[in-house]
């Protein structure tokens, strides 16, 4: 379910802003890098790494937005530039390409969590904690999207002339959207690092594909389910995606082939969805 938070971030850029943001592949490990540095280097309590990682990712999103809006660089190239630069930044922040935090407290294993967790739930505490954080992120995003700022965010993706006609800077709205999206992605990386108790420089490879696959699976399967919010379908889509990966690995498919298969399936889904849009347009 960690990837559910990642998928929420990708949902903002892909579905709402219509912005192909490849920054995700860099902001996911950026959140992890911040986390291990704060825990290892500064002894910051694990719970505080969550908002700090979110703010770090938000800053990354702002940089992507500024490159696109102020420097007039195309959206795809803006993401590629940030993703490339973040590789080095992540190494600087973490200190090396691999950092372990096995002997440190984290949000899943600390004196407070251990003291309040009933014995029969010990084996499920990781899932429960991730579920709670994901639900908080989801409902906060739902709330934000119901505000005036959230309305402007949806409008700038559908028809940015509406935003301009309201006297609002559409570029600023895009920057805000990118900051929230990458904040969520970085938060996901923060939780991932604490679950794995380590940081590895390559953990962001393919993160955007995972996020997009989750968004497309969720929104496609639950498009006609009226009582399901889109954010809920996106989170469920991430769970279904990981379940499919688990089944594939159980069936004996090499882990090295999983991402290739994911990319091919993702391409097929995209082509099918584009064909459906063309049919509807006709």
Where are these regions (language model features)?
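Cytosolic-side transmembrane-helix boundaries in multi-pass membrane proteins
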Residues: 158-172, 225, 229, 244-282
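Short, non-helical or kinked segments that cap or interrupt transmembrane helices
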Residues: 15-31, 67, 71-81, 149-152, ...
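Alpha-helical transmembrane segments within multi-pass membrane transporters and channels
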Residues: 43-84, 135, 237, 241
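Transmembrane alpha-helical segments in multi-pass inner-membrane proteins
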Residues: 182-260
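Transmembrane helix-bundle core of multi-pass membrane transporters
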Residues: 75, 79, 86-146, 176, ...
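Membrane-interface helix caps of multi-pass small-molecule transporters
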Residues: 12, 37, 62, 66-71, ...
């Amino acid at each position: 379910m960690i990837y559910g938070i990642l998928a929420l971030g990708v949902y903002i850029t892909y579905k709402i802003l219509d912005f192909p943001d490849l920054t995700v592949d860099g902001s996911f490990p950026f959140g992890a890098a911040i986390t291990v540095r704060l825990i290892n280097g500064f002894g910051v309590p694990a719970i505080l790494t969550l908002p700090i990682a979110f703010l770090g990712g938000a800053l990354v999103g702002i940089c992507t937005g500024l490159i696109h809006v102020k420097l007039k660089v195309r959206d795809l190239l803006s993401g590629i530039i940030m993703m490339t630069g973040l590789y080095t930044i992540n190494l600087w922040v973490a200190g090396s390409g691999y950092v372990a935090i096995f002997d440190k407290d984290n949000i899943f294993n600390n004196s407070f969590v251990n003291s309040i967790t009933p014995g029969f739930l010990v084996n499920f505490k990781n899932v429960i904690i991730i579920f709670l954080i994901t639900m908080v992120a989801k409902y906060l995003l739902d709330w934000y999207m119901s505000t005036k700022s959230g309305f402007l965010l949806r409008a700038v993706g559908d028809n940015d002339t509406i935003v301009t006609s309201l006297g609002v800077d559409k570029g600023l709205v895009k920057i805000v959207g990118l900051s929230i999206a990458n904040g969520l992605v970085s938060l996901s990386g923060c939780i991932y690092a604490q679950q794995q108790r380590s940081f590895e420089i390559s953990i962001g490879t393919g993160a955007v594909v995972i996020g997009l696959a989750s968004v497309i699976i969720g929104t496609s399967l639950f498009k006609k389910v009226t009582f399901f919010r889109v954010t809920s379908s996106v989170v469920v889509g991430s769970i279904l995606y990981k379940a499919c990966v688990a089944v594939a690995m159980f069936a004996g498919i090499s882990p090295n082939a999983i991402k290739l298969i994911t990319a091919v399936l993702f391409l097929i889904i995209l082509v099918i969805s584009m064909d459906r849009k063309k049919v509807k347009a006709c």
